[in-house]
Amino acid sequence: MAEPETCDLFVIGGGINGAGVARDAAGRGLKVVLAEKDDLAQGTSSRSGKLVHGGLRYLEYYEFRLVREALIEREVLLNAAPHIIWPMRFVLPHSPQDRPAWLVRLGLFLYDHLGGRKKLPGTRTLDLKRDPEGTPILDQYTKGFEYSDCWVDDARLVALNAVGAAEKGATILTRTPVVSARRENGGWIVETRNSDTGETRTFRARCIVNCAGPWVTDVIHNVAASTSSRNVRLVKGSHIIVPKFWSGANAYLVQNHDKRVIFINPYEGDKALIGTTDIAYEGRAEDVAADEKEIDYLITAVNRYFKEKLRREDVLHSFSGVRPLFDDGKGNPSAVTRDYVFDLDETGGAPLLNVFGGKITTFRELAERGMHRLKHIFPQMGGDWTHDAPLPGGEIANADYETFANTLRDTYPWMPRTLVHHYGRLYGARTKDVVAGAQNLEGLGRHFGGDFHEAEVRYLVAREWAKTAEDILYRRTKHYLHLTEAERAAFVEWFDNANLVA
């Protein structure tokens, strides 16, 4: 039998936390392997509300530390990846029967001041009868508030962390479940099997970090044959996508009768993303889907506030994700903490660091603190480095995306503006690697519809572990929303026959 490949840190899970840990650790000089059983971000991390935010509603549950840390991270990430993260203004129509105005004002005051806000504008009060933001809102709502948060392309955030990890020397394995992990001589023997090829590999790792998200306890019990007193609480969150039904770049946040809040955000130009629900989930994470009751719930919440009424047939697409929240014993799924918790098991001198909970916004800090927990295992590793480091594509002067975008348009005068915008927003400073020297549209290869060309496909396969048409259409990009059914089918057929994937 071949000698196992050696590494310092073996990361299980290719969602945002796993990719973040792999990048952080590799940048400290550790030899890192990450294994993901499906595609990067295929689980929870591509099915979020796509916000980098402090979490305004968490203030009601007195999560002041969590909100403060998330607000601080919001600015860090805005600087690190201004191409995939950008500021958004949220309009909150005031509904007196749901929360008194003084309470909303207090929450927004705290939100403005808890995190040392530097870049984003503060809160302002709106007269919905006079201010243009009130135009689509029903006349019964006369007062509102406007505040700042940030938007993020969640699946690309994961992919860019994985790219960043690989550029620091990490090995990234997708569609590669860990089939077994056992302690041996103060370390771990980890066996993986590639689902596509059947190839098995064996690694000798000093330490495992379990970032399996909804599957974290499966890994603890069934893969590592370990135990933990901690647990996750699975909470299902569903979103719907509809045609955008208001003018303006602002988003809306509405209060529902059940005290939950619903985001109504501009999405992919001419669409709107509406969510989320919060429902305790008992099923397999792989099987999660938005049900009719949830879709009706979201439509009803929107129709309470807007003049234009959504109907079921307006729903273009829906998706659902399972949030693996740390089980803090709270009964109400909305009240369960969004904070993260580490559980370090050093049985036999072979450390297993299990990660419970967390949210997109705090992934970088989670990774950094996770590495602090392992400092005694790797005393020679480098120090913290990610706070001021751009993510791949985010190497943009002063994190000034607008100036960068103008330069990009000047660089590629032959490109339609929508295509320059698409490349700039997904790839940032790496756009030149996607274009790969092309001098005209024909140089980008086959055109699949919309702003979708062959050069982008080849880049994603070569640089971002895209293995299937679905990986590209739904996660590395959102082309599925901009192609006709016939165009999608034609691309899938072309991709399946092009033999691009080694």
Swiss-Prot record:
Its EC number is 1.1.1.402. InterPro entries: DAO_C, DAO_C_sf, FAD-dep_OxRdtase, FAD/NAD-bd_sf, G3P_DH_FAD-dep. It catalyses: D-erythritol 1-phosphate + NADP(+) = D-erythrulose 1-phosphate + NADPH + H(+). Keywords: FAD, Flavoprotein, NADP, Oxidoreductase. Pathway: Carbohydrate metabolism; erythritol degradation. It is an enzyme of class 1 (oxidoreductase). Its cofactor is FAD. Gene3D superfamilies: Alpha-glycerophosphate oxidase, cap domain (1.10.8.870), D-Amino Acid Oxidase, subunit A, domain 2 (3.30.9.10), FAD/NAD(P)-binding domain (3.50.50.60). This is D-erythritol 1-phosphate dehydrogenase.
